[in-house]
């Protein structure tokens, strides 16, 4: 059975990332039988609250990739304004293409077929460095980030330590 264009593209992109891995993350397949499910390890970026942490996540690609974006979900507990309590990452680049019906994002900030898994992961590392508390996915984390930054830092550092212990 021939591979779909989506499968061929994902195989090529996975091979490229594994051959020349950018600093801060590594990727592989959840199961060798499906190119549509990737496991990701993100290393908390230097000079951030998440520094030194090891955060596991999955990237789930739709059959119509790259026309539509994948979904990303942390499987390691993380406390961040732009990560839903269930681990789903909420950043513009992962939102479907087109206009935002709520008017928070420009169409150019959302998913475009020219994006790649690498651009997504770089955006997630940037998100860890600079949380956006203006349109949060986790309202409690955003509120604590704004109103009680010391407690926010303590909670994040505790989860970073836990992520290291889980390795």
Swiss-Prot record:
List the catalysed reactions: S-ubiquitinyl-[E1 ubiquitin-activating enzyme]-L-cysteine + [E2 ubiquitin-conjugating enzyme]-L-cysteine = [E1 ubiquitin-activating enzyme]-L-cysteine + S-ubiquitinyl-[E2 ubiquitin-conjugating enzyme]-L-cysteine
One GO molecular function term of this record is:
ATP binding
Q: Which GO terms describe its biological process?
A: proteasome-mediated ubiquitin-dependent protein catabolic process; protein polyubiquitination
Q: Where would I find the UBC core domain in this sequence?
A: 5-165
Task: Extract the Pfam families matched here.
Answer: UQ_con (PF00179)
Q: Does the keyword Transferase apply?
A: yes
Per the record, the pathway is: Protein modification; protein ubiquitination
> What GO cellular component entries does it have?
nucleus
Which InterPro entries does the protein's record reference?
Ub_conjugating_enzyme (IPR050113), UBQ-conjugat_E2_core (IPR000608), UBQ-conjugating_AS (IPR023313), UBQ-conjugating_enzyme/RWD (IPR016135)
> What keyword terms does UniProt attach to this protein?
ATP-binding, Nucleotide-binding, Transferase, Ubl conjugation pathway
Catalytic-site annotation from UniProt: 90 (glycyl thioester intermediate)
Q: What is its EC number?
A: 2.3.2.23
Family membership: Belongs to the ubiquitin-conjugating enzyme family.
What PANTHER family is this protein classified in? UBIQUITIN-CONJUGATING ENZYME E2
Described function = Catalyzes the covalent attachment of ubiquitin to other proteins. Has a role in the formation of chromatin structures that influence the localization of transcriptional silencing factors.
What is the protein's name according to its record? Ubiquitin-conjugating enzyme E2 15
Q: Which organism is it from?
A: Schizosaccharomyces pombe (strain 972 / ATCC 24843)
Lineage of producing organism = Eukaryota, Fungi, Dikarya, Ascomycota, Taphrinomycotina
Gene name as annotated: ubc15
